[in-house]
Amino acid sequence: MPFTIDTARSIFPETLAADVVPATIARFKQLSAEDQLALIWFAYLEMGKTITIAAPGAANMQFAENTLQEIRQMTPLQQTQAMCDLANRTDTPICRTYASWSPNIKLGFWYELGRFMDQGLVAPIPEGYKLSANANAILVTIQGIDPGQQITVLRNCVVDMGFDTSKLGSYQRVAEPVVPPQEMSQRTKVQIEGVTNSTVLQYMDNLNANDFDNLISLFAEDGALQPPFQKPIVGKENTLRFFREECQNLKLIPERGVSEPTEDGYTQIKVTGKVQTPWFGGNVGMNIAWRFLLNPENKVFFVAIDLLASPKELLNL
């Protein structure tokens, strides 16, 4: 029976993803807008004690600058309302603009808002604000998970804000400029204990070099990529857009893996290692598994990227 994207998702079923992440995000979305904003603020303050967040580059922020300045010029009450509108996914011009941005621009926008709050330029969370019992329980959960999981929770919480893109009709996606690939002389080839497959090694090397055109050439025409806690992205065009919008300047540090032949001439390969993002650099390495299914032509038919469970989660199983 030939593989489908759906059946491919079940390769290496023993892989233990960080279930605490989607569970925490689901609980977060049930909170009031005020509690969501306060929780993000308190969580960032908490993270700031142990994690250094890198300032977004100017190229990222040029697209958000007008919106940020618009919010700065509002009254404190209007500023609070604008942020609540984002959390409530209200249909406003700011929420529509926000919805069109790539995840990195959204993250940069919230970074700048946090800086403005610190400087007193934007209405902060009211002094003495008390989180609801549910929000406080979520904050305690976030405090107890590892840094890579904290980042993923907070990222997904803010990325999903703004007006629902499915209701926008046709709209212009806004993403930061694509950085040029690294020169060949500057690239360092990865080595993975237990894996010598050229497609997998090139996948890692090309992604580390921001060489997205050569990266996408490794995929089958009907291939798919499944980001952590998301549905598969199918087709080369959609996958290439994902790489360009969400994977610039990542540092993949694969460590070891296993390769197994499977039915119909396909090969399944699992690699584990770490990924560092430009937002947090070497401060935080997210524990990742890559689950590849390669077709008989050695092209990527499917790859799932899993944020792995922490040692603490594994002990609780």
Curated annotation (Swiss-Prot):
Membrane topology of the entry: Peripheral membrane protein
Protein's UniProt keywords contain Transmembrane helix: no
GO molecular function: chloride ion binding; photoreceptor activity
GO cellular component, one term: plasma membrane-derived thylakoid membrane
Cellular location(s): Cellular thylakoid membrane
Cell membrane found in the keyword field: no
Keywords: Antenna complex, Chromophore, Membrane, Photoreceptor protein, Phycobilisome, Receptor, Sensory transduction, Thylakoid
PTM section of the record: Proteolytically cleaved into a red 16.7 kDa form named red carotenoid-binding protein (RCP) which lacks 15 residues from the N-terminus and approximately 150 residues from the C-terminus.
OCP N-terminal domain segment(s): 18-169
Binding site for 3'-hydroxyechinenone: 37, 203, 290
SUPFAM superfamilies recorded: NTF2-like, Orange carotenoid protein, N-terminal domain
Entry-linked PROSITE patterns: OCP_N
Cofactor field: 3'-hydroxyechinenone
GO biological process, one term: light absorption
InterPro entries recorded: NTF2-like_dom_sf, NTF2_dom, Orange_carotenoid-bd_N, Orange_carotenoid-bd_N_sf
Manner of cofactor binding, per the entry note: Binds 1 3'-hydroxyechinenone molecule per subunit.
A Pfam match: Carot_N
Family: Belongs to the orange carotenoid-binding protein family.
Protein role: Acts as a blue-light photoreceptor and photo-protectant. Essential for inhibiting damaged induced by excess blue-green light via a process known as non-photochemical quenching (NPQ). Binding carotenoids improves OCP's intrinsic photoprotectant activity by broadening its absorption spectrum and facilitating the dissipation of absorbed energy. In the dark or dim light the stable inactive form (OCP-O) is orange, upon illumination with blue-green light it converts to a metastable active red form (OCP-R), inducing energy dissipation, quenching cellular fluorescence via NPQ.
Subunit structure, interactors included: Homodimer.
Name the record gives this protein: Orange carotenoid-binding protein
Organism (species): Limnospira maxima (Arthrospira maxima)
